[in-house]
Amino acid sequence: MPVHPYLTDEELALLNELYQQEQPESLLSLTIAIDANIRPLLEQASHLELKLALGEVKLHFPVTLKHQEASEEQAELSPPSIITDGFHPRAWRLPSPQELQLYQPNGRPLAAEIRDLSINGMRLLSRRRLFTKQQSKRVLLSLGQEQQIPLRLQLVRQHRGHHFWLTAVRFELPVAERMTLSDFVFRGFLQEISRRQPED
């Protein structure tokens, strides 16, 4: 992950409050006053988002509008897409995600360690080559708590080191599964930022 300035305690608290699914009763209300003439545009918009910039990392929170009274709208944030805005922008990768396991279609664990994970790919470390003749592989990604996401891994590249194979793969997900994985990665992002905070 590219180096970016540490967040202040207030900024970190804001991030944690913006999206708090485990405690739905703890919500941050953000009031925005806009010109009433914009309402027709909001009703026609196919996409609305809140963007947070933290150094070279950009968080894009999808916004869902819920119509209330004629002069009032209620908006809800969904898990964000996290992008590292470097020379080649790409999805932010959660390093060494914990409690994750890949399973083969027969139910056996895939003999590979997930080195990092994004919402559209991952890097795997294994003692043996994962891809031989076929360039794709079907697996189940277990997120714990009985959450499993079916994936069709597409080989990007694989490299043989002295003792291990390092394999990069990509995948695409339907909306519901993508939201689930985005939520997991975002929580990992918040934990990673918390660990990087300087101690008092």
Stretch-by-stretch model annotation:
Residues M1-D200:
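Structured alpha-helical
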